[in-house]
Amino acid sequence: MNIAICPGSFDPITTGHLDIIRRASKLFDHVVVAVGSNLRKQPRLSAAERARLIEKVTADLENVSVEVMEGLLVDFAREQGARVVVKGLRAVSDFESEFEQAQLNRTLYPELETVFIMSASQHSFLSSSAVREIAALGGDVRGLVPDGILETVRQIYSRSDGKI
């Protein structure tokens, strides 16, 4: 079985993330969405809560599962029996850091390949950080996050004080 990992913090999952997951699900036998933590950020929701939101919007994808990932991606990939990491690229600027991470992962787990999927043009500007900022400032995030979690995202990420 050809298993791929789609890792991220998904704080929150965006329509761009979901597009990459859907496209990866057509390329691989099984896709594991690995919900991790970014040590440089303090997420509003726990990894388990973010995973539940992703499960809700990927429920129609039979070959996609969602797991909380703790520790190194390479260790998680080994545990899952995966030899592929799928990453979305929005712009050339994403490539440099993703390339470095892919090289590091390959050093730690030589059998692990990284496959880059170019974001659809309508998602090329989209990031979780932008969604958090728009929601915190009272803006409309419709179309930026999956419809199935729109109200949840509005409630969690909107703040009356405008802080992100």
Curated annotation (Swiss-Prot):
Q: Which cofactor does it need?
A: Mg(2+)
**The protein's Enzyme Commission number:** 2.7.7.3
Q: Can you tell me which residues bind ATP?
A: S9, F10, H17, G88, L89, R90, E98, H123, S124, F125, L126, S127, S128, S129
> Which residues make up the annotated site Transition state stabilizer?
H17
GO:BP terms for this protein? coenzyme A biosynthetic process
Q: Which controlled-vocabulary keywords does the entry list?
A: ATP-binding, Coenzyme A biosynthesis, Cytoplasm, Magnesium, Nucleotide-binding, Nucleotidyltransferase, Transferase
Q: Which reaction does it catalyse?
A: (R)-4'-phosphopantetheine + ATP + H(+) = 3'-dephospho-CoA + diphosphate
InterPro entries the UniProt entry points to: Cyt_trans-like, PPAT, Rossmann-like_a/b/a_fold
The EC class name is transferase
Oligomer and partners: Homohexamer.
Q: What is this protein called?
A: Phosphopantetheine adenylyltransferase
What is the native source organism of this protein?
Rubrobacter xylanophilus (strain DSM 9941 / JCM 11954 / NBRC 16129 / PRD-1)
